[in-house]
Amino acid sequence: MKSAELKKSLLLYAVTDRAWLGKTFCCETLSDAVLQAIEGGATLIQLREKEIPEKEFLDEAFRIKEICASKKIPLIINDNVKIAKETDACGVHIGQSDMELKEARKILGAEKIIGVSCQTVEQALQAEKNGADYLGVGAIFSTSTKADAGNVSISTLKEICRAVKIPVVAIGGISLQNMSQLKGSGIAGVSVISAIFAQQDIRGATKELKSSAEKLFLSFSE
C-alpha cells in the first residue's frame, strides 16, 4: 500500500472488542459488528483478541478478512504476527513490549503494513527509523479498554507528529464528544474501540464519527 493510500485508510481506524458481545452489543457476532462498522464508514479494521485461544483467533481472523476484502478495507492484526502472516492480512500493529519491528518485517515482508504504539517522541523516532509505516500514539484520553495504557498529552501528540514523517493515529478514549480537541494536532486519523463497538447502533455511531474525522483530517491539510 502506497503511503498516500495508507494515510487515507487511517482516518477512522476501528479496533474490535468482543467484550461487548451479549452486553450492549447490537450484533450476534463480531463479524456482524465489523460489517456494520465498515458500512458506517470505518476506513480500517484492527482485529484485537487478547483472551481467546490461538485457533479461535485464527478462525475469526479469516472471517473478518473475508468481510474486509469484500469491502476493500484494510485488515490489521493486533500483536500476532503469525496470524497476520497466515491470513495474509494487510499488516500488524505491535506495542513496545511485543515482537521487535525488524523481526516482524522479516516475517511479513516489505509490502505489509506495520504500525507501532508509542508514547514518547523518542519511541516514535526509533519506530520510524526501524521502518514503521505508521504510529499509534496514546492513550490520549482515559480509557477502560486498555487499563495498562499510560496517558499521553495532546502536547506530546503534537510533538510526535512534528518529529516524524510517517502518519500518526491518536488512540485511547476517543469519542464523538472529545474528538474536536485533536483538531490541528497533525494526526492522520483516530483509532476507536468503544465509541464504535460498544454502541447499540454501530453503523450510525460510525457514520457520525466518520463525519467528525473527515472535518478533523481536512483541517490538517489547510
Segments and roles (model prediction):
Residues 137, 169-174, 190-194:
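Glycine-rich beta-strand-to-loop/alpha-helix junction loops that act as flexible
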